[in-house]
């Protein structure tokens, strides 16, 4: 069945493309020359490690990784335990508090428990130089993540895409809205959240869609790994 395909099955060929090898080489060269790149090399592909292709229920698109020390670990919007929750994620928590009964804002910003339930937290650019937003925007990552989105579009059905802000919405233009459920809103950043992210109800609507399809809804309360054992 289609949803038994793995990321390896569908991306192995893409990862041999010259542009992709060049992207990896450029990032590796910068690291070797002493430039601090986030996230650490072992974490660059964590979105795919934590959420297998056949398990994807929801896709949340970010832009590029956080560029402060210790923040980025390969999942869009998420930060490691012990790192202050960034403003956009705080606004996501605020929307959850306002719409999900019983949701209480956690004291961390670690979203692995979302990823493990089938929420693909995908940045469209997978690396960044320390302190320099969008510094790797033209390295080829966008081509790769465009391919990822097209593969989800092609191989899965009934995935909820949460597209926040114009960048994510442009990126998601290829999604077949007959096969998938696309929800759009302004970005949760403090600059734009008040223009319609607050009140968009996306977390509730995503779960309603999943339940209508007979799938388990997402528990949006982020849980640290030790707490979930």
UniProtKB/Swiss-Prot annotation:
Pfam families: UDG. Its main location: cytoplasm. It comes from the Bacteria. InterPro entries: UDG_fam1 (IPR002043), Ura-DNA_Glyclase_AS (IPR018085), Uracil-DNA_glycosylase-like (IPR005122), Uracil-DNA_glycosylase-like_sf (IPR036895). GO terms for biological process: base-excision repair, AP site formation via deaminated base removal. SMART domains: UDG, UreE_C. Keywords: Cytoplasm, DNA damage, DNA repair, Hydrolase. It catalyses: Hydrolyzes single-stranded DNA or mismatched double-stranded DNA and polynucleotides, releasing free uracil. CDD domains: UDG-F1-like. Its EC number is 3.2.2.27. One of its GO terms (cellular component) is cytoplasm. The active site is at residue 64. One of its GO terms (molecular function) is uracil DNA N-glycosylase activity. It is found in: Cytoplasm. HAMAP family: UDG (MF_00148). Belongs to the uracil-DNA glycosylase (UDG) superfamily. UNG family. Excises uracil residues from the DNA which can arise as a result of misincorporation of dUMP residues by DNA polymerase or due to deamination of cytosine. This is Uracil-DNA glycosylase. The gene is ung.
